[in-house]
Amino acid sequence: MKVESVTKEDTKKSERKIKIAIAKPEDYSNKNVILEKEEELICPVCGSKSIIKDYERAEIVCEMCGCVLQQNLFDVGPEWRAFDHEQRVKRSRVGAPMTYTIHDKGLSTVIDWRNKDSYGKDISADKRAQLYRLRKWQRRIRVSDASERNLAFALSELDRIASKLGLPRNVRENAAVLYRGAVEKGLIRGRSIEGVAAAALYAACRRCKVPRTLDEIAEVSRVDRKEIGRTYRFISRELNIRLAPTNPVDYVPRFASELKLPGEVESKAISILQKAGERGLTSGRGPTGVAAAAIYIASVLQGTRRTQREVADVAGVTEVTIRNRYKELTEHLDIDVTL
């Protein structure tokens, strides 16, 4: 068997030139910044960012030009398969993943509250007293100083608001990252923890295209709408958060679901809003009012009409707003609606 020697020069020539952009902790304008160091692969041939990880062929490939960026890719996932959450929990041999929604990122340990041994048997009274003391000191150790206590309180408040609003996990992670960024830059001083947490959650909702209005967040938080809006503008400026105006289309699925409207109405409303956007009818107008008017028009056209009062209650706007937006959309888009 012939073995060829490989020099350092040959190794350098064979290396793939992959541009890696690592997100800096102070750059919070990118909506995909979830981890402290997140890698982004860019094709060295065409410059595309559309990169596919093909684990079957063990390759990283550019979707646009087909250039193979890396070979012999290792799959770092588990070797077992699970088809539901119960199987996944049963077969997993590691703890929970790291998360930014816990003040210590979920890396510390917790002593179980059940007074049982590894065989499931009850432990003695002496052991129970010892475990009680250990649990007490464990709680104290996890939160060592005032800054950690404040962070733990803020993240619990953030999680409480998110639970009330039914927000998904990625929104909570984004909000936690934004709040930690505000703490690192000293933006909390002189402001309430609840206000900054609510503002971070509002920014995360807009970033993840899961829109919630300031009124909705203020209703479940301990601060008013005015303070949340003022704090949101402040942290957006200081953290360099650039967010596009909220698209009315993003509100349609939620409003249609709450009104129990069929999918045809939702699709029709989205079509109306897309045409309105092309003609500039959504600029300078509240996205919730425009979305509510489009849903009202679509429900009438599809024969599943909802009253203006019903739509207004769900969207959090007045009936006058719906009528004004309704007139604009029907006149400029030549929609014939028979009431």
UniProtKB/Swiss-Prot annotation:
User: Coiled-coil segments, which residues?
Assistant: none
Q: PROSITE patterns, from UniProt?
A: TFIIB (PS00782), ZF_TFIIB (PS51134)
The record ties this protein, via Pfam families, to: TFIIB, Zn_Ribbon_TF
Give the sequence repeat ranges: 156-239, 250-331
Q: Which GO terms describe its molecular function?
A: DNA-binding transcription factor activity; TBP-class protein binding; zinc ion binding
SUPFAM superfamilies in UniProt: Cyclin-like, Zinc beta-ribbon
Ordered alphabetically, the record's keywords are:
Metal-binding, Repeat, Transcription, Transcription regulation, Zinc, Zinc-finger
Q: Where does Zn(2+) bind?
A: 43, 46, 62, 65
Tree of life domain: Archaea
Which Gene Ontology BP annotations are present? Answer: transcription preinitiation complex assembly
**Which CDD domains does the entry link to?**
CYCLIN_TFIIB_archaea_like_rpt1, CYCLIN_TFIIB_archaea_like_rpt2
For this protein, the record's SMART domains field holds: CYCLIN
> Which Gene Ontology cellular component annotation is one that this UniProt entry carries?
transcription preinitiation complex
InterPro entries recorded: Cyclin-like_dom, Cyclin-like_sf, TFIIB, TFIIB_arc, TFIIB_CS, TFIIB_cyclin, Znf_TFIIB
- Where are the annotated TFIIB-type zinc-finger regions? 39-70
PANTHER family attached to this UniProt entry: TRANSCRIPTION INITIATION FACTOR IIB, TRANSCRIPTION INITIATION FACTOR IIB-RELATED
The record describes the protein's role as: Stabilizes TBP binding to an archaeal box-A promoter. Also responsible for recruiting RNA polymerase II to the pre-initiation complex (DNA-TBP-TFIIB).
Family, per the entry? Belongs to the TFIIB family.
Full protein name: Transcription initiation factor IIB
Q: Which gene encodes it?
A: tfb
